[in-house]
Amino acid sequence: FGSLLGICLATQIITGLLMAMHYTADTTLAFTSVAHTCRNVQFGWLIRNLHANGASMFFICIYLHIGRGLYYGSYLFKETWNTGVILLLTLMATAFVGYVLPWGQMSFWGATVITNLFSAIPYIGQTIVEWAWGGFSVDNPTLTRFFALHFLLPFIITGLTLVHLTFLHETGSNNPLGIPSECDKIPFHPYFSIKDILGFMAMLLPLMSLAMFSPNLLGDPENFTPANPLVTPLHIKPEWYFLFAYAILRSIPNKLGGVLALAASVLILFLIPFLHKSKQRTMTFRPLSQLMFWILVANLLILTWVGS
């Protein structure tokens, strides 16, 4: 899945650059500039749909990648694992600021709700929120800085990816038995290159089908309405890939408690290398650990479903 994530990143940067050429980061023009891209730019509709659904593929791949890492004990490469978790956090930040850019209803209210969470931080919270907003509400300054961040972060992700790979190359990669594989090393090309191409095909087919046939399947219809600070949507919810965390946030009545639980649901990944107590690295021959792992997966799926 690592190679797929690399392809996702490249695709997102290319489509994103093409979209940035036609986008205007201004509250009065953002929504119409996106509509203009879809209507009047050559293949603008395709570029936008690939960019929007490419984000979904990115998250599918990264969640599978993390799940695989948990299952096979890859977290024992501590540096690789920690840079990976930082990559996940950066990706989440990028997806969040990007979702705000079309300046539809859900963009605006999503930005309002999520940035507002920082006000739960004792003493300095309110100051941080107003500083992030650039005013007393989500407005033009917020949009322009979010565009700047959304442009910058993917390049930070690219840099972190190189760090991630550098650390991985220190140890070499893991395998399903969790045993040294020095004697099984084979040339990257043609073996791994062909294997990776199979993966790209398997990912590109659903992505293309999604972008061509039902590009709005995963989006929120509210976002077809231009942002209006005076009208709150009935159900404010993020894109599907954040629903598990959003469900955790909403299930706790206390604001600070919810924010801490939300943060913990992702940051817990940093602790995993310290929680490994088994003599075996992978879960291949550990049925009880497997049971716990699949309960975790089911739990996340249920949270995602409940969150919507």
Swiss-Prot record:
Record key words, sorted: Electron transport, Heme, Iron, Membrane, Metal-binding, Mitochondrion, Mitochondrion inner membrane, Respiratory chain, Transmembrane, Transmembrane helix, Transport, Ubiquinone
Positions annotated to bind heme b b566: 65, 164
Gene Ontology terms: biological process: mitochondrial electron transport, ubiquinol to cytochrome c
Alphabetical list of PROSITE patterns matching this protein: CYTB_CTER, CYTB_NTER
Binding, a ubiquinone: 169
Gene Ontology MF term list: metal ion binding; ubiquinol-cytochrome-c reductase activity
TM spans (from-to): 1-21, 45-66, 81-101, 146-166, 194-214, 256-276, 288-308
Cellular localisation: Mitochondrion inner membrane
Mode of membrane association: Multi-pass membrane protein
Cofactor note: Binds 2 heme b groups non-covalently.
Residue numbers binding heme b b562: 51, 150
Any one GO CC term of the record: mitochondrial inner membrane
Superkingdom as given in the UniProt entry: Eukaryota
Cofactor: heme b
Family statement: Belongs to the cytochrome b family.
Summary of subunit composition and partner proteins: The cytochrome bc1 complex contains 11 subunits: 3 respiratory subunits (MT-CYB, CYC1 and UQCRFS1), 2 core proteins (UQCRC1 and UQCRC2) and 6 low-molecular weight proteins (UQCRH/QCR6, UQCRB/QCR7, UQCRQ/QCR8, UQCR10/QCR9, UQCR11/QCR10 and a cleavage product of UQCRFS1). This cytochrome bc1 complex then forms a dimer.
Function: Component of the ubiquinol-cytochrome c reductase complex (complex III or cytochrome b-c1 complex) that is part of the mitochondrial respiratory chain. The b-c1 complex mediates electron transfer from ubiquinol to cytochrome c. Contributes to the generation of a proton gradient across the mitochondrial membrane that is then used for ATP synthesis.
PANTHER family: CYTOCHROME B (PTHR19271:SF16)
Note: Heme 1 (or BL or b562) is low-potential and absorbs at about 562 nm, and heme 2 (or BH or b566) is high-potential and absorbs at about 566 nm.
Protein name listed in UniProt: Cytochrome b
Organism: Scytalopus magellanicus (Magellanic tapaculo)
